Amino acid sequence: MLILAVLIGAGMALVEPVKGLIRQKYSNDAIAVAESAIIQGEGTITFEVPASPALAIPGEEGEEDTGLDKLIRDMKELSGEHESLTLLGILEIPCIDVKEPIWDTCSANALRYGVGRYPGTSNIGEPGLCNLFGHRQIGNLDAKLGSIQYLQEHIGEEVIVTTTDGTMHIYKIVKTVYVKDADLMPYLDPKTYDEETLCITACGWGKDPVTGKTYPMNTEFIVICQPASED
């Protein structure tokens, strides 16, 4: 019985890393498809990703069930239904080694495989505020924006967004802020800024790795970027 318990425990410990690798594979495949579209200037394209709840990010749906039944169900569901998502381009933040596909939605499923444009905010490259959301889940190997809080040490660094029509948009980081969910609305309104502004948003709760300050649940970390000058 002890050996069986050890084997079960070891198997369960491997589940999240395996799921992370699967999610990352689809993210990488989406980047490859976007890069091909960029070269050819294809414009907006679609890409299929798994829609199975088996690939949910830890904490996405509340407390995780870690029982053996859950493990077996998850493994059976991995080949289930897929969803077609609109792929807008690629987000790159060189100073923290981020390169992720950008989806035209912030659905839970889309954010498992990249970052998403918040519905109703400006389109990339247009006047007003465009907000890209992503996960900063603690302890996940495939956290899309796992190092985002370090950008408070990189004011002035470049953020690059290349859309699938082949257009490269280069921004500079101008500011980072922590915002409570209750105060988030200005960062979801395209009219908050008249000029073109890119925000990148992820959860901000927990201990800040730079300042050491601890932030409560329902807090977001936002990076505010504006177009780099051409001179």
Where are these regions (language model features)?
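Solvent-exposed, non-transmembrane regions of membrane-associated and secreted proteins
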Residues: L2-D231
